[in-house]
């Protein structure tokens, strides 16, 4: 793990640059490209972004981190508490005066790590609070659902933590964007490490979160490990937010597997 070093300043720089680049120039509408026809085009001196994150549910810890990062990015965009970071960017597009001269305001929603709740909160932020862009989320199921809504409403969706191949693959939308890597990339990147650390003669057992990310994560890791020569003993789906995984232990122990692969995230990963 020591080979991969991330520092706080570098992460913040990347986050602010990405957020500004995505938020600033994009105003799209279903079936139209004229800027003055954009959905929720701001007419005053502020522009509103919608931060749709899990504030409850099994991925709430990740949502809290996301929201803190978004709030910090807004301060940077508005030139509040920047600490001189913007001046270190090679691009000078960010001036600390908001987006295109408009001060950035934000509203928030709780996805609850549920697709229906996430759509409802995104719709409220768009229709009632004038959000010009929706971003956030820690579940690929949520990401797919919300980007579908944003497609219908002509609003940009910048996905948060979505790792499923399908977000910008099978379920891609014109108004949906991602900065996060996907499950395929994880599988390809892990291959050489797994071979070096564990060899090519292993028997793997998968416990997998039962939704789009878990499915594509399992598939991608299986493709990699089987390509190394590993045998896949079993793949077992588990509900998101299961909490207690003790019922799954005995089958794993009796399977003959010597590697357990947990395709889990958030509190489910901690518990499993």
What are these regions (language model features)?
Residues 98, 108-115, 234-244:
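Short beta->alpha junction loops
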Residues 150, 218-272:
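Extracellular/periplasmic bilobed ligand-binding domains
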């Amino acid at each position: 793990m020591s080979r991969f070093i991330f520092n706080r300043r570098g992460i913040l720089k990347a986050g602010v640059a990405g957020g500004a680049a995505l938020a600033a120039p994009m105003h799209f509408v279903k079936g139209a490209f004229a800027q003055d026809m954009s959905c929720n085009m701001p007419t005053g001196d502020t522009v509103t972004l919608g931060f749709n994150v899990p504030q409850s549910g099994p991925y709430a810890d990740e949502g809290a981190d996301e929201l803190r990062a978004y709030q910090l990015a807004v301060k940077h965009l508005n030139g509040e508490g920047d600490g001189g970071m913007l001046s270190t960017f090679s691009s000078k597009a960010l001036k600390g005066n908001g987006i295109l001269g408009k001060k950035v305001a934000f509203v928030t929603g709780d996805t609850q790590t549920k697709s229906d709740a996430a759509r409802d909160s995104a719709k409220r932020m768009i229709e009632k609070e004038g959000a010009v862009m929706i971003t956030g989320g820690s579940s690929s199921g949520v990401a797919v659902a919300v980007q579908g809504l944003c497609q219908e409403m002509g609003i940009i969706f910048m996905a948060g933590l979505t790792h499923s191949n399908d977000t910008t693959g099978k379920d891609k939308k014109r108004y949906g964007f991602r900065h996060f890597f996907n499950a395929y990339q994880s599988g390809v990147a892990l291959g050489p490490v797994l071979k070096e650390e564990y060899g090519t003669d292993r028997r793997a057992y998968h416990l997998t979160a039962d939704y789009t990310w878990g499915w594509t994560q399992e598939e991608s890791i299986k493709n990699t490990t089987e390509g190394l020569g590993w045998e896949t003993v079993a793949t077992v789906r588990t509900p998101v937010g299961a909490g207690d995984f003790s019922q799954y232990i005995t089958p794993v122990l009796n399977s003959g597997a010597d590697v357990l692969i947990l395709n889990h995230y958030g509190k489910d990963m901690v518990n499993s």
